[in-house]
Every structure is written in structure tokens, then in C-alpha cells.
Amino acid sequence: MGCTLSAEDKAAVERSKMIDRNLREDGEKAAREVKLLLLGAGESGKSTIVKQMKIIHEAGYSEEECKQYKAVVYSNTIQSIIAIIRAMGRLKIDFGDAARADDARQLFVLAGAAEEGFMTAELAGVIKRLWKDSGVQACFNRSREYQLNDSAAYYLNDLDRIAQPNYIPTQQDVLRTRVKTTGIVETHFTFKDLHFKMFDVGGQRSERKKWIHCFEGVTAIIFCVALSDYDLVLAEDEEMNRMHESMKLFDSICNNKWFTDTSIILFLNKKDLFEEKIKKSPLTICYPEYAGSNTYEEAAAYIQCQFEDLNKRKDTKEIYTHFTCATDTKNVQFVFDAVTDVIIKNNLKDCGLF
């Protein structure tokens, strides 16, 4: 007599198959979910990378969303010129044209009365005259001696355009805006059949205690370093060189037991600013022992070695380093493509899916 399954047994087999199928689907789904943590000291470019993900992997910023950044563009522009004027007093730099002193006084009055999201023709005129002044330019060239937004020159050089009454910020204007990240900003997007969850965490010291609960189940960490920070001090601690702070932080992340199996991707960012700065500000400010030339290639390679040498598990853990310019969409697109390939190779090969 043949061996036949009872209806009950058949149901049990079907149930078992379904459970296996569900487990496999759950496994595949989990394998396709990528949790990325963006870490780094304050103003290293983390939030700009997040904005680029929206531009590259989503539809970018709509006209309506761009309009909402108008107030931030104006605020960044006004705060930048104010920071330069204040620094002139501290650094004892005179205006090239004595008449600009009246403009400076006017600037503080008009800026204080300015309505959010609006720039009057009078205020724009004052800022334009000040920015053209040789004393203001001399102070701008010494910006490493005080705190100034990276985007200062970008906005101030383009004042004619951004001061127009019908001005709508471009994607590039939005990328250049600076708003301090407080707390954690989460972004979702799909790329190469993977579902990314990217977490941007505030980099200032006061924000770092909020990181800890993000650590669980992280696929990869993108650690951002501003190359151009080598001759700057922290906004929150003027005794601390920004690059040294970044190295300390990278050391603690790279060698953390939480991240033994986590891919570490190092973005040496702001390469465009670094390339300009290294011509006039020597790397020995940050690394007194540096004996190389102040060329972009040699100085950048030296900084790369300083960070990669902090890795105490070189035999088992690789650091994937990329030189980036977070405001350059094509560069970020190219680098992120390479990063995704590393993630696929490292984190999904175990599942036999790729």
C-alpha cells in the first residue's frame, strides 16, 4: 500500500513551507535594509551629504521646499558679514574706505530690524559695499582666526542674485545653507535595490550623547572629516584644534567594540576648500612634525594616513577612504555608488543574494 499523507499532515507540510518562505523573505528583506550612521565633528558636512541623497536618490527639492530655505540663505549671508565685521574689531583691521564704518553701523541696525525671509534693497546695498571693501576682504582672508561659515563667500559674491525680490534658492543654494543639526535626522531612500535608512547626528560635543541609541544594527558608518579644518579651532572650545578633535572622535568610533563588524567609510570632505587653503596656510599648524610640501596631493595623503593609522585592527578591519566635496552632486553621486558596492560586498554576501 502506498504511503499517503493525511489531510492534516498535508496542512502541516504546507504550514512548514509557508514558515520557511516567510523566514526567507524576512531574511531577504533584512538583507536589503541598510542602516547608515553619519558621524563626525560639527560642520564636517554630514547634513550636506543627507541633502545630496535627497537630490540624487529622490526628486530633489521642489520649488516650494526651496522657497522655505530663503530665510536660511538670508540669515547665513547676514550672519557671515556680521562675523567678519566683528572680527575686524578684534583683529584691529581698518576699513579700506573710512565711509564703510557708517555702513557697518547701519548693517547692525538693518539686520536687527530685518523681517525673516526678506532682504531690503537698503540692507543688500550696505552688505554689497562692505563686502567689496579691501579691509573686509583682508579680514575675510584671515577667517581661520575666528568662526565663519564655509558658505560666506558663496552667498556674498552672489548678492545681486539672492537679493532679488523674486529670488528662489537653487538646489546649490540649499546645499550651501548651514543650520546646526540638533538631535537626529533620519532619511530613507532606495538605491540598487537596497532600502537605506540614513541617520545624521549632530556633531557638536553637546549633541554626541544622543548618538548611542542609533548604534544597534548599523550596517556602515560614514565618518565625515572636514579637511579644511586643519588650521581651525572648535566653536565650542577655542583651545582645541578641529582636526585633532576629529581624530579623537574617529579613534573612539573606529576602535569601538560596538563596531567590530561594521564597515567604516571615511569621507575626507571639503577637498575644494582644502586645496585652496593649503596654498597659504601650512599643514604644520596642525601637524608640527609634517615635513612634506604644502601641495594638495601630499598634504591630503598625510591626513589620510593620520586617520587610517588610528585603526587598531588593521589586519581584520579595513577603512574605506574617499576624498569628497559634499556640495558637488556629481562627486557625491560617484562616491556613494562606490560606497554602496562596498556595503553590498561586505554585508550582503553572507545571505547568498548577490
Swiss-Prot record:
GO biological process entries: adenylate cyclase-inhibiting G protein-coupled receptor signaling pathway; adenylate cyclase-inhibiting serotonin receptor signaling pathway; adenylate cyclase-modulating G protein-coupled receptor signaling pathway; cell division; cellular response to forskolin; G protein-coupled receptor signaling pathway; negative regulation of synaptic transmission; neurotransmitter receptor localization to postsynaptic specialization membrane
PROSITE patterns given in the database record: G_ALPHA
Lipid group attachment sites (S-palmitoyl cysteine): C3
PTM annotation: Myristoylation at Gly-2 is required for membrane anchoring before palmitoylation.
Primary location group: nucleus
Binding site for Mg(2+): S47, T181
Class of this enzyme: hydrolase
Phenotype for E43A: Mildly impairs receptor binding; mildly decreases basal and receptor-stimulated GDP exchange
EC id: 3.6.5.-
Molecular function, one GO term: GDP binding
Residues binding GTP: 43-48, 150-151, 175-178, 200-204, 269-272, 326
Effect of C3S: Abolishes palmitoylation
Result of altering F336Y: Strongly increases basal GDP exchange rate; mildly decreases receptor-stimulated GDP exchange
Chain positions covered by the region annotation G4 motif: 265-272
Keywords from the named record: Cell cycle, Cell division, Cell membrane, Cytoplasm, Cytoskeleton, GTP-binding, Hydrolase, Lipoprotein, Magnesium, Membrane, Metal-binding, Mitosis, Myristate, Nucleotide-binding, Nucleus, Palmitate, Transducer, Transport
Catalytic activity: GTP + H2O = GDP + phosphate + H(+)
UniProt region (G3 motif), positions on chain: 196-205
Result of altering F189Y: Increases basal GDP exchange rate; no effect on receptor-stimulated GDP exchange
Family listed: Belongs to the G-alpha family. G(i/o/t/z) subfamily.
Functional note: Guanine nucleotide-binding proteins (G proteins) function as transducers downstream of G protein-coupled receptors (GPCRs) in numerous signaling cascades. The alpha chain contains the guanine nucleotide binding site and alternates between an active, GTP-bound state and an inactive, GDP-bound state. Signaling by an activated GPCR promotes GDP release and GTP binding. The alpha subunit has a low GTPase activity that converts bound GTP to GDP, thereby terminating the signal. Both GDP release and GTP hydrolysis are modulated by numerous regulatory proteins.
Subunit comment: Heterotrimeric G proteins are composed of 3 units; alpha, beta and gamma. The alpha chain contains the guanine nucleotide binding site. Part of a spindle orientation complex at least composed of GNAI1, GPSM2 and NUMA1. Identified in complex with the beta subunit GNB1 and the gamma subunit GNG1. Identified in complex with the beta subunit GNB1 and the gamma subunit GNG2. Component of the TAS2R14-GNAI1 complex, consisting of TAS2R14, GNAI1, GNB1 and GNG2; within the complex interacts with TAS2R14; this complex plays a role in the perception of bitterness.
Stated name of the protein: Guanine nucleotide-binding protein G(i) subunit alpha-1
Source organism (scientific name): Rattus norvegicus (Rat)
